[in-house]
Amino acid sequence: VNSGVGSVMVGHIALPQIDSTTIRPLPKDLRSKPLDTDEGGEIIEEESTIPATLSPAMGAILRNDLKFPGLIVTDALSMSGLTIYFTQEEAAVRALEAGADQLLKPANVDAAFNGVLQAVKSGRLSEQRIAESARKILAAKYDLGLVQQRLTLVDSIDRVVAGKDAINLAREIAEHAITLVRDEDKLVPLDLKPDAHIVNLAITNGDDRLWIANAFVSRLSRGGRKIDTIVLDERSSEKEVQKAVEMAKTADLVIASLYGRVRSGQARSVGLPDAGARALSALIENKSRLLGISFGNPYLLQTFPGLRTYMVAYGDMVSLQHAAARAVLGEIDIVGKLPISLPGLYPRGT
Protein backbone atom coordinates (compact mmCIF):
# COMPACT_ATOMS: atom_id res chain seq x y z
CA VAL A 1 0.00 0.00 0.00
CA ASN A 2 2.79 2.41 0.92
CA SER A 3 4.47 1.75 -2.42
CA GLY A 4 1.39 2.94 -4.31
CA VAL A 5 0.01 -0.29 -5.76
CA GLY A 6 -3.17 0.23 -7.74
CA SER A 7 -5.01 -2.92 -6.68
CA VAL A 8 -5.02 -5.61 -4.02
CA MET A 9 -6.29 -9.17 -4.51
CA VAL A 10 -7.79 -10.67 -1.36
CA GLY A 11 -7.61 -14.46 -0.95
CA HIS A 12 -10.06 -16.94 0.53
CA ILE A 13 -7.96 -17.26 3.68
CA ALA A 14 -9.69 -17.54 7.03
CA LEU A 15 -8.12 -15.51 9.84
CA PRO A 16 -10.20 -16.24 12.94
CA GLN A 17 -7.96 -13.92 14.97
CA ILE A 18 -9.47 -11.06 12.95
CA ASP A 19 -12.95 -12.36 12.11
CA SER A 20 -14.22 -15.48 13.90
CA THR A 21 -17.62 -15.59 12.18
CA THR A 22 -18.52 -19.27 11.73
CA ILE A 23 -19.58 -20.67 8.35
CA ARG A 24 -20.93 -24.14 7.55
CA PRO A 25 -20.98 -26.14 4.29
CA LEU A 26 -24.01 -25.85 2.05
CA PRO A 27 -26.06 -28.91 1.16
CA LYS A 28 -24.40 -30.41 -1.91
CA ASP A 29 -27.38 -29.75 -4.16
CA LEU A 30 -27.04 -25.99 -3.59
CA ARG A 31 -23.37 -25.73 -4.49
CA SER A 32 -21.84 -24.53 -7.73
CA LYS A 33 -19.22 -26.88 -9.14
CA PRO A 34 -15.81 -25.54 -8.06
CA LEU A 35 -13.46 -24.86 -10.95
CA ASP A 36 -10.27 -25.32 -8.93
CA THR A 37 -10.66 -29.04 -8.17
CA ASP A 38 -10.27 -31.96 -10.57
CA GLU A 39 -12.89 -34.70 -10.69
CA GLY A 40 -12.17 -36.89 -7.68
CA GLY A 41 -9.88 -34.29 -6.11
CA GLU A 42 -9.86 -33.88 -2.37
CA ILE A 43 -12.21 -31.22 -0.96
CA ILE A 44 -12.23 -30.35 2.72
CA GLU A 45 -15.77 -30.11 4.05
CA GLU A 46 -16.04 -28.89 7.62
CA GLU A 47 -17.13 -25.94 9.69
CA SER A 48 -14.79 -22.99 9.24
CA THR A 49 -14.58 -19.23 9.72
CA ILE A 50 -15.38 -16.58 7.15
CA PRO A 51 -12.71 -16.11 4.44
CA ALA A 52 -11.06 -12.70 4.14
CA THR A 53 -12.73 -12.17 0.75
CA LEU A 54 -16.16 -11.95 2.38
CA SER A 55 -15.21 -10.41 5.71
CA PRO A 56 -16.10 -6.76 6.44
CA ALA A 57 -12.84 -6.66 8.39
CA MET A 58 -11.01 -6.86 5.06
CA GLY A 59 -12.48 -3.61 3.77
CA ALA A 60 -12.13 -1.91 7.13
CA ILE A 61 -8.43 -2.72 7.34
CA LEU A 62 -7.66 -1.71 3.76
CA ARG A 63 -9.85 1.38 3.52
CA ASN A 64 -9.86 2.72 7.08
CA ASP A 65 -6.65 1.53 8.69
CA LEU A 66 -4.31 1.50 5.68
CA LYS A 67 -6.11 4.26 3.73
CA PHE A 68 -5.91 2.21 0.53
CA PRO A 69 -7.62 4.13 -2.32
CA GLY A 70 -7.24 1.56 -5.10
CA LEU A 71 -9.18 -1.42 -6.39
CA ILE A 72 -9.94 -4.36 -4.12
CA VAL A 73 -10.27 -7.55 -6.17
CA THR A 74 -11.55 -10.90 -4.93
CA ASP A 75 -9.88 -14.22 -5.53
CA ALA A 76 -11.88 -16.43 -7.90
CA LEU A 77 -15.45 -16.89 -6.69
CA SER A 78 -15.39 -20.28 -8.42
CA MET A 79 -12.92 -21.75 -5.94
CA SER A 80 -14.04 -24.48 -3.57
CA GLY A 81 -13.13 -22.32 -0.57
CA LEU A 82 -16.29 -20.36 -1.38
CA THR A 83 -18.53 -22.73 -3.33
CA ILE A 84 -18.68 -25.20 -0.43
CA TYR A 85 -20.07 -22.54 1.90
CA PHE A 86 -21.92 -19.99 -0.23
CA THR A 87 -24.09 -19.83 -3.32
CA GLN A 88 -22.68 -17.65 -6.08
CA GLU A 89 -25.44 -15.12 -5.42
CA GLU A 90 -24.54 -14.84 -1.74
CA ALA A 91 -20.77 -14.85 -2.32
CA ALA A 92 -21.03 -11.95 -4.80
CA VAL A 93 -23.17 -9.85 -2.46
CA ARG A 94 -21.02 -10.55 0.59
CA ALA A 95 -17.85 -9.66 -1.31
CA LEU A 96 -19.30 -6.27 -2.22
CA GLU A 97 -20.51 -5.76 1.34
CA ALA A 98 -16.98 -6.54 2.53
CA GLY A 99 -15.55 -3.80 0.32
CA ALA A 100 -14.50 -5.56 -2.89
CA ASP A 101 -14.73 -3.64 -6.16
CA GLN A 102 -14.22 -6.44 -8.68
CA LEU A 103 -15.60 -9.96 -8.42
CA LEU A 104 -13.20 -12.34 -10.12
CA LYS A 105 -14.26 -15.40 -12.10
CA PRO A 106 -17.65 -16.48 -10.73
CA ALA A 107 -18.54 -20.13 -11.30
CA ASN A 108 -21.89 -18.86 -12.58
CA VAL A 109 -21.81 -15.30 -13.91
CA ASP A 110 -25.58 -15.04 -14.26
CA ALA A 111 -26.11 -16.17 -10.67
CA ALA A 112 -23.57 -13.68 -9.32
CA PHE A 113 -25.08 -10.85 -11.39
CA ASN A 114 -28.63 -11.67 -10.35
CA GLY A 115 -27.58 -11.94 -6.73
CA VAL A 116 -26.18 -8.41 -6.81
CA LEU A 117 -29.20 -7.13 -8.74
CA GLN A 118 -31.65 -8.54 -6.19
CA ALA A 119 -29.55 -7.19 -3.32
CA VAL A 120 -29.83 -3.68 -4.80
CA LYS A 121 -33.57 -4.04 -5.39
CA SER A 122 -34.12 -5.21 -1.81
CA GLY A 123 -31.98 -2.45 -0.34
CA ARG A 124 -29.33 -4.81 1.01
CA LEU A 125 -26.82 -3.08 -1.29
CA SER A 126 -27.23 0.56 -2.26
CA GLU A 127 -26.85 1.91 -5.77
CA GLN A 128 -24.29 4.28 -4.29
CA ARG A 129 -22.18 1.30 -3.21
CA ILE A 130 -22.22 -0.15 -6.73
CA ALA A 131 -21.48 3.26 -8.28
CA GLU A 132 -18.51 3.73 -5.95
CA SER A 133 -16.82 0.57 -7.25
CA ALA A 134 -17.82 1.31 -10.85
CA ARG A 135 -16.12 4.72 -10.63
CA LYS A 136 -12.94 3.14 -9.29
CA ILE A 137 -12.88 0.58 -12.09
CA LEU A 138 -13.45 3.24 -14.76
CA ALA A 139 -10.77 5.46 -13.21
CA ALA A 140 -8.30 2.57 -13.25
CA LYS A 141 -9.07 1.89 -16.91
CA TYR A 142 -8.54 5.56 -17.71
CA ASP A 143 -5.21 5.64 -15.86
CA LEU A 144 -4.05 2.58 -17.79
CA GLY A 145 -5.02 4.08 -21.14
CA LEU A 146 -7.79 1.55 -21.73
CA VAL A 147 -10.25 4.26 -22.71
CA GLN A 148 -8.15 5.17 -25.74
CA GLN A 149 -6.82 1.65 -26.43
CA ARG A 150 -9.49 -0.85 -25.38
CA LEU A 151 -7.96 -3.90 -27.06
CA THR A 152 -4.54 -5.38 -26.42
CA LEU A 153 -2.29 -5.56 -29.46
CA VAL A 154 -1.61 -9.28 -29.30
CA ASP A 155 1.35 -9.13 -31.66
CA SER A 156 3.16 -6.76 -29.31
CA ILE A 157 2.83 -8.88 -26.16
CA ASP A 158 6.02 -10.86 -26.70
CA ARG A 159 8.01 -7.68 -27.30
CA VAL A 160 7.00 -6.48 -23.84
CA VAL A 161 6.71 -9.64 -21.76
CA ALA A 162 9.73 -11.32 -23.33
CA GLY A 163 11.59 -8.12 -24.10
CA LYS A 164 15.10 -7.32 -22.96
CA ASP A 165 14.02 -5.13 -20.05
CA ALA A 166 11.62 -7.77 -18.71
CA ILE A 167 14.21 -10.53 -19.02
CA ASN A 168 16.85 -8.45 -17.25
CA LEU A 169 14.44 -7.59 -14.44
CA ALA A 170 13.44 -11.25 -14.05
CA ARG A 171 17.10 -12.24 -13.83
CA GLU A 172 17.84 -9.56 -11.23
CA ILE A 173 14.86 -10.55 -9.07
CA ALA A 174 15.74 -14.25 -9.34
CA GLU A 175 19.36 -13.74 -8.37
CA HIS A 176 18.34 -11.76 -5.29
CA ALA A 177 15.76 -14.38 -4.30
CA ILE A 178 17.94 -17.50 -4.08
CA THR A 179 18.20 -18.53 -0.42
CA LEU A 180 20.74 -20.92 1.07
CA VAL A 181 18.88 -22.04 4.17
CA ARG A 182 21.38 -24.65 5.34
CA ASP A 183 24.81 -25.82 4.18
CA GLU A 184 26.15 -28.12 6.88
CA ASP A 185 28.34 -30.01 4.39
CA LYS A 186 29.77 -26.84 2.80
CA LEU A 187 28.72 -27.88 -0.69
CA VAL A 188 27.99 -24.36 -1.99
CA PRO A 189 29.72 -23.08 -4.01
CA LEU A 190 30.81 -26.26 -5.74
CA ASP A 191 34.43 -27.22 -5.22
CA LEU A 192 34.75 -30.25 -7.46
CA LYS A 193 37.18 -31.38 -10.13
CA PRO A 194 36.01 -30.76 -13.71
CA ASP A 195 35.57 -34.51 -14.25
CA ALA A 196 33.60 -35.07 -11.03
CA HIS A 197 30.54 -37.28 -11.33
CA ILE A 198 27.40 -35.22 -10.64
CA VAL A 199 23.92 -36.71 -10.60
CA ASN A 200 20.89 -34.46 -10.81
CA LEU A 201 17.82 -36.18 -9.36
CA ALA A 202 14.84 -34.12 -10.52
CA ILE A 203 11.59 -34.85 -8.67
CA THR A 204 8.45 -33.23 -10.04
CA ASN A 205 4.79 -33.24 -9.06
CA GLY A 206 3.82 -32.07 -12.55
CA ASP A 207 3.37 -33.67 -15.95
CA ASP A 208 6.61 -32.18 -17.25
CA ARG A 209 9.33 -34.77 -16.78
CA LEU A 210 10.65 -34.37 -20.34
CA TRP A 211 11.76 -30.77 -19.87
CA ILE A 212 11.36 -29.57 -16.29
CA ALA A 213 15.06 -29.75 -15.35
CA ASN A 214 16.49 -28.62 -18.69
CA ALA A 215 17.05 -24.96 -17.76
CA PHE A 216 18.84 -25.81 -14.52
CA VAL A 217 21.02 -28.57 -15.96
CA SER A 218 21.97 -26.65 -19.11
CA ARG A 219 23.14 -23.66 -17.06
CA LEU A 220 24.92 -25.82 -14.49
CA SER A 221 26.77 -27.80 -17.15
CA ARG A 222 27.94 -24.74 -19.06
CA GLY A 223 31.68 -25.03 -19.47
CA GLY A 224 31.63 -28.75 -20.16
CA ARG A 225 30.78 -30.22 -16.77
CA LYS A 226 28.97 -33.55 -17.27
CA ILE A 227 25.76 -34.10 -15.32
CA ASP A 228 23.66 -37.25 -15.35
CA THR A 229 19.97 -36.54 -14.84
CA ILE A 230 17.16 -38.83 -13.80
CA VAL A 231 13.59 -37.57 -13.37
CA LEU A 232 10.98 -39.07 -11.05
CA ASP A 233 7.29 -38.18 -11.06
CA GLU A 234 3.93 -39.69 -10.07
CA ARG A 235 4.24 -42.35 -12.79
CA SER A 236 7.73 -43.53 -11.88
CA SER A 237 8.17 -47.20 -11.03
CA GLU A 238 10.06 -48.77 -8.16
CA LYS A 239 12.68 -49.82 -10.72
CA GLU A 240 13.29 -46.14 -11.56
CA VAL A 241 13.55 -45.31 -7.86
CA GLN A 242 16.20 -47.98 -7.37
CA LYS A 243 18.07 -46.80 -10.48
CA ALA A 244 18.24 -43.29 -9.03
CA VAL A 245 19.52 -44.60 -5.70
CA GLU A 246 22.17 -46.75 -7.40
CA MET A 247 23.33 -43.87 -9.61
CA ALA A 248 23.76 -41.73 -6.52
CA LYS A 249 26.04 -44.27 -4.86
CA THR A 250 28.79 -43.63 -7.43
CA ALA A 251 28.36 -39.85 -7.57
CA ASP A 252 30.72 -37.26 -6.12
CA LEU A 253 27.66 -35.05 -5.63
CA VAL A 254 23.92 -35.53 -5.92
CA ILE A 255 21.73 -32.51 -6.58
CA ALA A 256 18.09 -33.13 -5.74
CA SER A 257 16.18 -30.54 -7.75
CA LEU A 258 12.73 -30.57 -6.17
CA TYR A 259 9.82 -29.29 -8.23
CA GLY A 260 7.02 -29.38 -5.66
CA ARG A 261 4.83 -26.60 -7.03
CA VAL A 262 1.38 -25.48 -5.88
CA ARG A 263 -1.24 -27.19 -8.06
CA SER A 264 -4.74 -26.16 -7.10
CA GLY A 265 -7.16 -29.04 -6.63
CA GLN A 266 -4.53 -31.75 -7.04
CA ALA A 267 -3.55 -34.49 -4.62
CA ARG A 268 -0.19 -33.70 -2.95
CA SER A 269 -0.61 -30.24 -4.40
CA VAL A 270 2.55 -28.81 -2.84
CA GLY A 271 4.52 -31.97 -2.06
CA LEU A 272 6.55 -34.55 -3.93
CA PRO A 273 5.27 -37.76 -5.54
CA ASP A 274 5.74 -40.97 -3.56
CA ALA A 275 8.44 -42.33 -5.86
CA GLY A 276 10.51 -39.18 -5.55
CA ALA A 277 10.01 -39.00 -1.80
CA ARG A 278 11.23 -42.60 -1.40
CA ALA A 279 14.32 -41.94 -3.49
CA LEU A 280 15.16 -38.75 -1.63
CA SER A 281 14.69 -40.44 1.75
CA ALA A 282 17.01 -43.25 0.65
CA LEU A 283 19.72 -40.78 -0.39
CA ILE A 284 19.46 -39.02 2.96
CA GLU A 285 19.65 -42.34 4.80
CA ASN A 286 22.68 -43.40 2.72
CA LYS A 287 24.42 -40.15 3.72
CA SER A 288 25.03 -39.19 0.10
CA ARG A 289 26.75 -35.87 -0.60
CA LEU A 290 23.43 -34.24 -1.28
CA LEU A 291 22.37 -30.72 -2.20
CA GLY A 292 18.62 -30.19 -2.15
CA ILE A 293 17.14 -27.28 -4.12
CA SER A 294 13.43 -26.50 -3.93
CA PHE A 295 12.10 -24.97 -7.13
CA GLY A 296 8.73 -24.36 -5.53
CA ASN A 297 7.46 -25.17 -2.05
CA PRO A 298 10.00 -23.78 0.47
CA TYR A 299 8.58 -25.95 3.27
CA LEU A 300 10.00 -29.23 1.90
CA LEU A 301 12.77 -29.17 4.49
CA GLN A 302 10.15 -29.90 7.14
CA THR A 303 9.30 -33.14 5.35
CA PHE A 304 12.96 -34.00 4.75
CA PRO A 305 14.84 -32.50 7.73
CA GLY A 306 17.78 -34.79 7.02
CA LEU A 307 18.79 -32.61 4.05
CA ARG A 308 22.05 -31.14 5.32
CA THR A 309 22.30 -28.64 2.47
CA TYR A 310 19.10 -26.93 1.37
CA MET A 311 18.57 -24.09 -1.08
CA VAL A 312 15.27 -22.47 -2.07
CA ALA A 313 14.60 -20.97 -5.51
CA TYR A 314 10.81 -20.54 -4.99
CA GLY A 315 9.75 -21.39 -8.55
CA ASP A 316 10.62 -23.23 -11.76
CA MET A 317 10.85 -20.27 -14.14
CA VAL A 318 13.92 -20.23 -16.35
CA SER A 319 15.26 -17.14 -14.56
CA LEU A 320 15.08 -18.90 -11.18
CA GLN A 321 16.60 -22.14 -12.46
CA HIS A 322 19.47 -20.23 -14.04
CA ALA A 323 19.97 -18.19 -10.88
CA ALA A 324 20.07 -21.34 -8.75
CA ALA A 325 22.69 -22.86 -11.05
CA ARG A 326 24.79 -19.70 -10.90
CA ALA A 327 24.52 -19.67 -7.11
CA VAL A 328 25.65 -23.29 -6.90
CA LEU A 329 28.61 -22.50 -9.14
CA GLY A 330 29.57 -19.47 -7.06
CA GLU A 331 28.99 -17.04 -9.92
CA ILE A 332 26.67 -14.85 -7.83
CA ASP A 333 26.45 -13.98 -4.15
CA ILE A 334 23.58 -15.65 -2.32
CA VAL A 335 21.66 -12.88 -0.57
CA GLY A 336 18.09 -14.18 -0.34
CA LYS A 337 16.29 -14.56 3.00
CA LEU A 338 13.37 -16.80 3.90
CA PRO A 339 10.11 -14.83 3.54
CA ILE A 340 8.42 -17.39 5.78
CA SER A 341 9.34 -19.42 8.87
CA LEU A 342 10.04 -23.15 8.73
CA PRO A 343 8.43 -24.05 12.07
CA GLY A 344 10.81 -25.84 14.37
CA LEU A 345 13.75 -25.27 12.04
CA TYR A 346 14.40 -21.73 10.83
CA PRO A 347 12.69 -18.38 11.45
CA ARG A 348 11.67 -15.96 8.74
CA GLY A 349 14.64 -13.92 7.62
CA THR A 350 17.14 -16.79 7.76
Predicted regions and their residues:
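Second-shell residues forming the walls of enzyme active-site clefts
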Residues: 1-129
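Preference for extracellular/luminal or secreted protein segments
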Residues: 50, 55, 84-350
